[in-house]
Design a protein with these regions (language model features):
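Residues at the start of alpha-helices and the adjacent loop-to-helix junctions
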Residues: 4-8, 19, 104, 203, ...
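N-terminal secretory/membrane targeting signals
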Residues: 1-27
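Polytopic alpha-helical membrane-helix bundles and their juxtamembrane interface segments
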Residues: 26-103, 116-258
Length: 258
């Protein structure tokens, strides 16, 4: 028996996304200074993520059933990120310190979900082995655990950097030359192939911002924490919102063909 209609599901998803916003938006009760450009970037990106969440959840009702999961995951990515960004903003305003713990908690949830998107869009058009899912997940966790351990001081920053890079390169191999990349090239229709390719380049070029920030911020100390946070924030816009827009575009395109 179907418990919820499509309209009811859409309403519930949007309500859940918006309900958390007032609670976390005023968590610290601090005023935002007009010259605090890092704090301003946290706020702008927080609201952009909330708006993206509402958009992705609404659009799930526009696409075919096989694409709904992908679009819902895109909305979950931006929702989780929005909540964490409000708290990261509070940490920055209250202490002036980099919110490393909140940022990595966000990444530990959202980055694996982004990687799962590769698996989901391939599953929508072909029979896909679960090996793709697990390889992308494992590569993501290796990358993030290495990065966090290095930034938080649990291991040597160089060792953390190397471990993180190994995880990233493992992901790149899978989506370019591994089973996922081959499946996209051989079985995907042109619209899916194009989306998959764009997503790959976001993971290649967009994600390169993070190890560069790590290198200049923690290994050489040549970048200020203010610059590092702004760079990370802008990178998250590209790597979360743009990623979801690509999924939305191919989902709508393929649904309209059906």
């Amino acid at each position: 028996m179907k418990l919820f209609s499509g309209k009811a599901t859409k309403t519930a998803l949007i309500a859940a996304a918006l309900a958390v916003t007032p609670t976390v938006a005023f968590a610290a009760g601090e005023n935002l200074a007009s010259d605090d450009f890092v704090g301003i970037s946290f706020w702008l990106i927080s609201m952009a993520l909330v708006a993206s969440t509402a958009f992705f959840f609404i659009e799930t009702q526009r696409v075919e059933g096989k694409w709904k999961t992908s679009l819902t995951v895109s909305g979950l990515v931006t929702l989780v990120a929005a909540v964490h960004y409000f708290y990261m903003r509070d940490v920055w305003i209250s202490t002036g310190e980099t919110p490393t713990v909140y940022r990595y908690i966000d990444w530990l949830i959202t980055v694996p979900l982004l990687m799962i998107e590769f698996y989901l869009i391939l599953r929508a058009i072909a029979n896909v082995s679960s090996g793709i899912f697990w390889r992308l997940t494992i590569g993501t966790l290796i990358m993030l655990v290495g990065g966090y351990a290095g930034e938080a001081g649990y291991m040597n920053v160089w060792l953390g950097f190397v471990i993180g890079m190994v995880g990233w390169f493992y992901i790149l191999y899978e989506i370019f030359a591994g089973e996922a990349g081959k499946l996209s090239a051989e079985q995907a229709p042109e619209s899916v192939k194009s989306a998959f390719s764009t997503m790959r380049w976001i993971v290649t070029i967009g994600w390169a911002i993070y190890p560069l920030g790590y290198f200049f911020g923690y290994m050489t100390a040549s970048a200020s924490m203010e610059s590092l946070n702004v760079i990370y924030n802008l990178a998250d816009v590209l790597n979360k919102i743009a990623f979801g827009v690509i999924i939305w575009s191919v989902a709508v395109s393929e649904s309209e063909k059906a």
